[in-house]
């Protein structure tokens, strides 16, 4: 994935609104939200989203009932190639009771979590990389 300044600007402007709900005006873009206090540790956000892997069944492309896994599937969605994130300190986040938190918003393009589709194909890493790419850390890259 590559960093995208437009997605960053969209995420930043939405984070500054301090709303704990998806941006309904984000168009055809994926989105993950994360809130944390007293400081924002990006590693915790990524660990939290990736931690949902245990609730996801790739074979059936479903989450364990009652659990969330959409953050994880968006992070690993193979056709998503752009990401941009923004963060803001909010005294109050609309939709959350805890006060004085940092809100992280990440937007993705193209979006993942498409109904009836899997986030990636099972198989050896990099086996399906396009011809003009290389395998770096078990991921297709330029």
List the predicted regions and their residue ranges.
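Mature extracellular or exoplasmic CAP/SCP-family domains and secreted bioactive peptides
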Residues: 1-142
């Amino acid at each position: 994935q590559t960093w995208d300044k437009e997605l960053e600007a969209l995420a930043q402007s939405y984070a500054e609104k301090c709303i704990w709900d998806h941006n309904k005006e984000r168009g055809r873009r994926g989105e993950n939200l994360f809130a944390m206090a007293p400081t924002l540790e990006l590693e915790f956000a990524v660990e939290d989203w990736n931690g949902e892997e245990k609730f996801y069944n790739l074979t059936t492309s479903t989450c364990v009932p009652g659990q969330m896994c959409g953050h994880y599937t968006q992070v690993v969605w193979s056709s998503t190639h752009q990401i941009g994130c923004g963060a803001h300190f909010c005294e109050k986040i609309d939709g959350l009771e805890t006060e004085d938190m940092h809100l992280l918003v990440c937007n993705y393009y193209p979006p993942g979590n498409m109904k009836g589709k899997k986030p990636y194909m099972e198989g050896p890493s990099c086996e399906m990389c396009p011809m003009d790419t290389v395998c770096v850390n078990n991921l297709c890259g330029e």
